[in-house]
Amino acid sequence: MKQVNRIMTKLMVGCFVGISATLLVLIISGTLGSIGTEFGSLKSPILTYCASGICEYEPIINFMMSWIIMSILSMLFISNVIFVLSVLLKKRTSCFFSSLLFLFACTWGCTKIAPIFSIVHLIPTTYLNCLQVLSGEIGYLTQNNNINALTGIIVLLVCNIVLTIINFSLMKMREVK
């Protein structure tokens, strides 16, 4: 039970740090953006894409709940990936660069490598850029209609559960040695 608490604490701290960093960036950019003008409105339009190629503008408030849920799951996914790599790789520097390279390459590859476009909706790093997913931009770029908020939440949730199980297994194996 002690090990479970320790792993969950590490994951929650990683998620908290990620969410805090995101909030800090949003607060700073919102503050800087409001200098000389008003703060803005939740009715501000965002360009959305659909499979037919017809674009529409929708208010940002329509995306807020999905964006918050996907952002939290994305931060937890990033924390889980880093935690798994930190258990596998002993050195902090190699863990940092491996995590950075893995997450960047997978996120970039989801929209650039054409042969995987048909399965890109099953890759969790597709959903790390929540706003592009919610606006339909990634689905439009990859011509994959399965990329949406619901699929993203399910994929990120399943991957987080699997990575948490892997974390527990790796910690148990490490404890046995």
Predicted regions and their residues:
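Alpha-helical transmembrane segments of multipass membrane proteins
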Residues: 27, 80-84, 104, 108, ...
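Residue-level recognition of pore/gate-forming positions within transmembrane alpha-helices
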Residues: 14, 100-104, 160
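Transmembrane helix segments
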Residues: 21-22, 89-124
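Interfacial "coupling" helices/loops that link adjacent transmembrane helices in transporter permeases
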Residues: 1-9
